[in-house]
Every structure is written in C-alpha cells, then in structure tokens.
A protein has these predicted regions:
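Membrane-interfacial loop-to-transmembrane alpha-helix junctions, especially the N-terminal start
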Residues: 23-35, 84-99, 149-160, 211-222, ...
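Membrane-interface interhelical loops and short amphipathic "cap" helices
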Residues: 43-64, 108-125, 171-189, 232-237, ...
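Hydrophobic cores of alpha-helical transmembrane segments in multi-pass inner/ER membrane proteins
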Residues: 64-80, 128-143, 192-207, 245-258, ...
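Loop-centered beta-sheet repeat module
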Residues: 151-205
Length: 336
C-alpha cells in the first residue's frame, strides 16, 4: 500500500472514533439494546434450524425480534448522541447504516432467491453485510467506554456479544450445536469443532485479561456467550437449551476460578497456564455435555475413553500456545 494511501486510511479510521459516553444510565441502555438485538439474531437462527419448512417469507416473528432490536439500538444511540450534542459520523453510525442496507438487501434476497438453508445463511452477501454492521455497532459500545484501561459492564457485554457473534457466524463449527456428529462416525469433523471453539475461548481470555477484567466480569463474559448459544435451541429443544445454560454456568465458574488464580499468583507463565486451563476446561465440560446427552437420548457415543480424554488434553496444548500471544516476545513478560 502506498504511504500516502496508508496515512489517509489511518486518518479516516481516526475520523470514525466515537465520543466517550460516561453516563452510567446511558451505558445500561446499550446493554438492554445489545441483548434485545442479538438474542433476536439467535432466535432467528433457531427458526432457520427448527422451523425452516415453515419459513416462506422475510416477514417472520423471528425477524421482527431481530430488527426491532436493531431499531431500538439505533434509537438508543440517537438519544445518547443527541443528549451529548454529538453529531459526528462515527463507527457506530457507519455500522448502523451498513446493517440497515444489509437488512433491506436481505429482504430483496429472500424475495428473489428464497430462504437459505444449511450454511448458506451464514455466508450470503446480505448476511455478511449484517455481520459487518453488527460488529461495528458493538465496537461503538466498546470504544465509548468511560475508561480506556478498564471495562465497565456495557463493555464486557459488548465483548461477550462480539465473541458470540463470531460463534454465530461459525455455528456450523460449534460442538454444542453440532454435537450429533460425535454420535456418528465423522470423528475428524467432530474433533475439529471442539478444537476450534476451545482455542477461540482461550484467545478471548488472553484478549480480555489485558483489560484487567475482574473474575466476576470474566464469568459474565463467558456465561453470556453460552446464554446466546443456548437460544439457538429455543424453538425446538428446550431441554438442550437448559443443558447448554447449565454447562455454560459450570464452565464460567471455572473461568472465574482461573482468573482468581491469575491475579494472585507470581507464576512467570501464568498467562500461558491460564489460557491452557480455559481451553482444557472447555473440552472437559463439553465431554460432560456429551455424556449427559447420551444418557438422555437413544444416541450411542462412538468415542472411547482415550478419545474423550484427547478432547480435554489437546485443547490444553493449543491453549498454552495461544497464551504466548499475551507475552512480550523480547522480555517474555505478560503484556499489560
């Protein structure tokens, strides 16, 4: 990239930087908006999974929840920006515009080409626009936090929702949603889903710990991400939804304990050990999830005990390597 173009690009990104929002009540409004908006997205995903044969049009109750959440998010942003007399075109406005255009194009797409099935809804051009717009809107909530060194609750919810949005886009690689492959003979794909998501969990941990998230904030981050994922089963399998929430609570408590250890130890490789523990715990509680599903269904688990053990120990190795992303390459010390 030519130097002048690079400088111009940086300048344009700086122009999109939003104004800090310090009012705690305004920040709470954004929490409500995010939950409404993105729970709506997961409900729509549930409809595409369990009610796909009944969906014949863009105008469904599930889209109603999603787009009303989007509209509420826009209204909250407009209210807060107007109260602060902030009329700047920032990253949040850009995200809202992109999402709006994506929503309109999605309606046209459904009308002309019908309802997508399988992986198609996650990779169609209109949905990619929706994802981009949503990421930018969440980035707005995150970057307008009162303190650049620490995260408030709205920022933690934003990080958790971004994490959940990544899982939404890659839900075809999510073991909690594709657990059926563990009861078949597609072992390579099954293991891949678990390894991918366990590494993602450890990457999120390494990122979040740099903002000095408290143990309670870490619990919220991961618990909320599991709560989002559980909504995927809301329109077809309440038992599975409750099971995901239960396992997610246990895993999040494990993250809470790991974070407590991280802040109280002087271990020179604490970030690597913590990231490894997060990834391994993800595998451990997923094995518990599999065993419970087997006990509550007619499925027959094809994995032997050492294979299930590998779902716990292999993420441990991957997580340790991910933990190295949190240290300085020159000094080996944790990057603050």
């Amino acid at each position: 990239m030519p130097r002048n173009l690079w400088v111009y690009t940086i300048y344009m990104f700086n122009k999109l930087s939003p104004v800090v929002i310090t009012d705690e009540k305004d920040r709470k409004l954004f929490i409500i908006a995010m939950l409404w908006f993105f729970i709506g997205a997961w409900i729509d995903s549930s409809a595409h999974t369990y009610l796909i044969d009944d969906i014949e049009t863009f105008f469904t109750p599930w889209h109603g929840v999603l787009y009303s959440g989007y509209a509420f998010s826009v209204l909250v942003a407009m209210y807060v920006k107007n109260k602060m007399k902030d009329y700047k075109f920032d990253v949040g406005v850009l995200g809202a515009v992109i999402f709006g255009v994506g929503g309109a194009s999605d309606a046209v797409w459904h009308t002309l080409l019908g309802i997508e099935t399988g992986v198609e809804p996650l990779v169609s051009p209109s949905h990619l626009m929706l994802f981009l717009g949503a990421f930018l809107m969440l980035d707005y909530v995150f970057t307008t936090r009162p303190s650049k060194d620490q995260l408030d609750t709205a920022s933690v919810v934003a990080v958790s929702t971004i994490y959940a949005l990544v899982m939404f886009i890659t839900q075809f690689l999510h073991p909690y949603l594709q657990y059926g492959v563990f009861f078949g003979y597609d072992d390579a794909f099954a293991a891949g889903t678990l390894f991918f998501q366990s590494m993602l969990a450890s990457i999120v941990y390494v990122y979040a710990i740099r903002f000095k998230m408290s143990s309670k904030q870490m619990f919220l981050l991961y618990f909320l991400s599991f709560l989002y994922v559980s909504v995927h089963a809301s329109l077809g399998n309440i038992r599975l939804m409750l099971l995901i929430i239960g396992i997610g609570s246990l895993f999040s408590f494990g993250v809470f304990r790991v974070t407590n250890w991280y802040y109280t130890t002087d271990h020179d490789r604490k970030i690597q050990v913590s990231a490894a523990a997060i990834a391994s715990l993800y595998g451990l509680f997923f094995v518990l999830y599999l065993l419970i599903n087997q006990a509550q269904s007619d499925y027959e688990l094809t994995w032997r005990f050492y294979g299930l053990g590998g779902l716990v120990t292999t993420p441990l190795l991957f997580g340790y390597m991910v933990g190295n992303l949190g240290v300085s390459p020159s000094t080996g010390e944790v990057v603050e």
